[in-house]
C-alpha cells in the first residue's frame, strides 16, 4: 500500500496522544499515581481503543490518561523521546509532532515553558538514536481551557519559536470558536510561523472559513464538514489549502458514523489537497500504514490514488523546498 519511492509522512500526529501503555504503567508506579487497572494487560483497554469502539467520551478519557502520568519534566522528555522512536519504527520518513503544553502541564502544575523545553529536548534525544526519521514540532493552543490559558500557552511556545514550524488551535470547537483567538493568531503570523487549525470537526464549514480567512490557516485538521459547502470545497482546491485527514480517528470519535460517510473520497474527487494521518496513534492503536490499508481495503482507493495521497503529504509539509527534495532524494 505504500509507495517506496515517495517519502512517508504523518503531519497530524499528537505527541500527547501517543504515550505507550508500558510508559503509562511505569510512570504511574514511579510517581504513585493511581491507575485504573492492576496490570499492564488490564490497563490497555483504559488507554487504547479496543476493537470498534466509537465514542468521543471514551476516546477523550483514554487521551486524558496519557497526560495524567506526566508528573515531572523528565516524564515529558521521555514521552517526547519515545514519540520519535515510534515514528521511526512505524516507517515514517518525516513527521510533524504536535503538542499542547498546557494540556501536558495541567495535571501536575508543571511550568508551561518547561514542558515546551522538555519536549524539544526529548525529541532531540530521540533523533540522535533514530536519525533516519526527520521531525518537526507544532505547538497547540488548547481552546477548551479558555482564552487566558491559550495566551499562557502561546507565550511558552513563542519563547521557542525557532524550534517550531507551526501553531495549531485544538479542543472544543463549538464552545470556543476561532473568533476568540484572532489576537493570538496575529501574534503567530507576526512570528512567521505556519498555521494549521482543527476545524470542521465538531463545528460546521463556517469554522473552516473563519480559520482560513481570519486566523490565516493554510492547513486544516480534519475538515470533515467542508463537504457541506460547495463554495468552500472550490476555495480549498483553488488555494491549495491542505486537509489533514484522519479516517480512523474520525470513526472512533463518531465524527463520522461510518467510513462510507467519510469525506476523503469527496476531497480527492474535488481536487482538494488532502493527506492521510494518524491523529492520536497511541489512543487509536494504529500506525500510518494502517490508514493506507484502510483507505485501500475499506474505502476503495487504488494504489495510484494512495501514491497521490502520500505525495500530497510531502507537498503539505511545513518544510522548505530543499528539505522536500532531500526527502525524495533519500528514497531514490
Swiss-Prot record:
It is an enzyme of class 3 (hydrolase). Pfam families: A_deaminase. Zn(2+) binds at residues 12, 14, 198, 279. The record marks 222 as: Important for catalytic activity. Binds 1 zinc ion per subunit. GO terms for biological process: adenosine catabolic process; hypoxanthine salvage; inosine biosynthetic process; nucleotide metabolic process; purine ribonucleoside monophosphate biosynthetic process. It catalyses: adenosine + H2O + H(+) = inosine + NH4(+); 2'-deoxyadenosine + H2O + H(+) = 2'-deoxyinosine + NH4(+). Belongs to the metallo-dependent hydrolases superfamily. Adenosine and AMP deaminases family. Adenosine deaminase subfamily. PANTHER family: ADENOSINE DEAMINASE. This is Adenosine deaminase. It comes from Shewanella amazonensis (strain ATCC BAA-1098 / SB2B). The gene is add.
Amino acid at each position: 500500500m505504500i509507495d517506496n519511492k515517495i517519502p512517508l509522512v504523518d503531519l497530524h500526529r499528537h505527541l500527547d496522544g501517543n504515550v505507550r501503555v508500558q510508559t503509562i504503567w511505569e510512570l504511574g508506579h514511579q510517581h504513585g499515581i493511581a491507575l485504573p487497572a492492576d496490570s499492564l494487560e488490564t490497563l490497555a483497554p483504559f488507554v487504547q481503543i479496543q476493537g470498534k469502539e466509537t465514542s468521543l467520551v471514551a476516546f477523550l478519557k483514554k487521551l486524558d490518561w496519557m497526560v495524567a502520568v506526566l508528573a515531572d519534566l523528565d516524564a515529558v522528555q521521555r514521552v517526547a523521546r519515545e514519540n520519535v522512536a515510534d515514528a521511526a519504527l512505524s516507517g515514517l520518513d518525516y513527521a510533524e509532532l504536535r503538542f499542547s503544553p498546557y494540556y501536558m502541564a495541567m495535571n501536575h502544575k508543571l511550568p508551561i515553558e518547561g514542558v515546551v523545553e522538555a519536549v524539544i529536548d526529548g525529541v532531540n534525544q530521540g533523533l540522535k538514536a533514530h536519525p533516519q526519521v526527520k521531525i518537526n514540532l507544532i505547538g497547540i493552543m488548547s481552546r477548551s481551557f479558555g482564552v487566558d490559558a491559550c495566551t499562557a500557552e502561546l507565550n511558552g511556545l513563542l519563547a521557542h519559536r525557532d524550534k517550531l514550524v507551526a501553531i495549531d488551535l485544538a479542543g472544543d470547537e463549538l464552545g470556543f470558536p476561532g473568533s476568540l483567538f484572532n489576537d493570538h493568531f496575529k501574534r503567530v503570523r507576526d512570528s512567521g510561523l505556519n498555521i494549521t487549525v482543527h476545524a470542521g470537526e465538531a463545528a460546521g464549514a463556517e469554522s473552516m472559513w473563519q480559520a482560513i480567512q481570519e486566523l490565516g490557516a493554510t492547513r486544516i485538521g480534519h475538515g470533515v464538514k467542508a463537504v457541506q459547502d460547495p463554495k468552500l470545497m472550490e476555495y480549498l482546491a483553488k488555494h491549495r489549502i491542505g486537509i489533514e485527514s484522519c479516517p480512523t480517528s474520525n470513526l472512533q470519535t463518531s465524527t463520522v458514523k461510518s467510513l462510507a460517510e467519510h469525506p476523503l473520497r469527496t476531497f480527492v474527487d474535488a481536487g482538494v489537497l488532502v493527506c492521510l494521518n494518524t491523529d492520536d496513534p497511541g489512543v487509536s492503536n494504529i500506525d500510518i500504514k494502517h490508514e493506507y490499508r484502510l483507505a485501500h481495503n475499506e474505502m476503495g482507493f487504488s494504489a495510484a490514488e494512495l501514491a497521490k495521497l502520500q505525495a500530497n503529504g510531502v507537498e503539505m509539509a511545513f518544510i522548505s523546498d530543499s528539505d522536500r527534495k532531500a526527502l525524495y532524494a533519500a528514497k531514490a
